[in-house]
């Protein structure tokens, strides 16, 4: 059994980046970076929700997952904008947040995108995707929720309309998940 990561601290202060804290006055788990209450979910929880969506809505479930991610990504982007940090600091924080929240490890060209003004279709690579490892091998892309999160956050932070398509996925047998941001005109 793997040793637990030091992600939970009792009543940590605002400088406690990279951790989830328990607010001792409320007993609730919080993200001190985004200043939001959090809940921890496991792979079975996500798989159960996903499987029920697919059994109820068939192929429409992927659109629902994408829309849910889009909404969350937009809210995350707005929350990060409120922090009055430079775009580079915001993007670095977003990448770190991916690790802290357990999404996986991001490799993105976002810093280059900000500096060069977004040309082409940037790829966002996600290693060890929580969503893909939760579902297992299916032979198709499965990270619709993450694609929505990437699109939503990018729209807010880069102030352009995007769709995000997952082209590579662990569920298809690829070594990592890869998403392409496509600007909408």
Labelled PLM ranges:
Residues 1-144, 163, 168-178, 182-185:
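N-terminal accessory segment detector
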Residues 144-159:
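Active-site helix/loop of acyl-thioester processing domains in fatty-acid/polyketide metabolism
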């Amino acid at each position: 059994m793997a040793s637990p990561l030091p992600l939970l601290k009792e009543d940590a202060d605002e400088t406690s980046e990279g951790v989830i804290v328990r607010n001792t006055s409320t007993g609730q788990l919080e993200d001190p970076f985004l200043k939001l209450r959090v809940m921890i979910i496991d792979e079975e929880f996500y798989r159960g929700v996903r499987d029920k969506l697919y059994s109820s809505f068939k192929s429409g479930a992927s659109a629902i997952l994408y829309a849910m991610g889009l909404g969350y990504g937009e809210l995350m982007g707005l929350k990060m904008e409120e922090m009055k940090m430079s775009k580079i600091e915001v993007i670095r924080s977003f990448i770190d947040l991916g690790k802290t929240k357990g999404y996986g490890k991001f490799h993105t060209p976002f810093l280059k995108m900000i500096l060069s003004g977004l040309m082409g279709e940037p790829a966002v690579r996600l290693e060890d995707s929580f969503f893909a490892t939760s579902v297992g091998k299916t032979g198709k892309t499965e990270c619709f929720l993450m694609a929505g999160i990437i699109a939503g956050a990018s729209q807010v932070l880069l102030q352009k309309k995007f769709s995000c398509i997952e082209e590579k996925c662990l569920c298809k047998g690829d070594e990592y998940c890869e998403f392409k941001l496509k600007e909408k005109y």
